[in-house]
């Protein structure tokens, strides 16, 4: 059996028959993270993966009861319970059910409760009881796991430092979706076309990008398209208008994922993340993978999480100094147009090899969880 990189993929050595996995807490079966994890288990490991149906009943209590029943029923036939990325608060329940059924618990910590509510969205104060509750839930998710998944080495190291878990913490790279393929450059043009897409969350640091555009001034003609919606969009629009950048910036409402490719194809540069939080300094955002896989220059802030990506992407990846608008401005002034960029023709394959190596490690750790129950 071989992965996308062409190297042999190791199957778990956990007993006879295919591995049986219950994927619990999936909020959206089309979300790229759980789609890729599920595909790896099914296509490369020959696992049987069942997604526990999510209740849509009226009333929170009714939904909770339905979800617990779904978890218990599914776990009876599972060797592994895989808790999906947006349900870390369910980790103690998933742990209890998995233990009662003799299954291992794998937790995908890709989206932490605290970092999302406190760092990303800033919905609650770090000193609030709600923030403390989120910290406790995140810690419980790590402690409950037999195997804990995250997306980058820096974030994995931080989890180990903070929680000291007995279970392995395995970075599982995000990677680019199948639709993100190399795009021919747009016909020659004069202005540098820059693309931002996302939800205007603090992680993205859009305010810093606006500051950078102000600093560029007359140094270069730059046109920016901003695709997406979010609570902060109106504030960004106001800031752009007050800075006199209205002729440089075009705001576009959110589009389906399938339409992003056309926006990327038209761009010379795709923007990554520029936020000031610890998470912003430790992630490789979806848009970074996607922009690079499409053969576009990606400008994003410097992070050790980008080390492997940097070697695969070559000159397409441009890193800026954290929290520095002037560094972003310099990067945009010096960025090549798409038809001038030195883009490795196999950049998507190189990036996929980086992802596959992380999934190979996941396979090894999954294999080490121990013998499974015999199939009935």
Task: Show where each model-derived region lies.
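Nucleotide-activated donor-binding/catalytic signature segment of Leloir-type glycosyltransferases, i.e.
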Residues: 234-261
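Donor nucleotide-sugar binding/catalytic pocket of nucleotide-sugar-dependent glycosyltransferases
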Residues: 135-182, 189, 249-252
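Nucleotide-sugar-dependent
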Residues: 115, 204, 258-263, 272-292, ...
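Conserved donor-binding/catalytic core segment of Leloir-type glycosyltransferases
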Residues: 22-23, 186-213, 225
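A conserved mid-protein helix/loop that constitutes part of the nucleotide-sugar donor-binding site
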Residues: 32, 36, 200-215, 231-234
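A charged, aromatic-enriched C-terminal amphipathic alpha-helix characteristic of glycosyltransferases
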Residues: 36, 184, 322-323, 336-370
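Membrane-proximal helix-turn-helix segments that form the acceptor-binding/catalytic region
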Residues: 65-72, 96-100, 107, 128-148
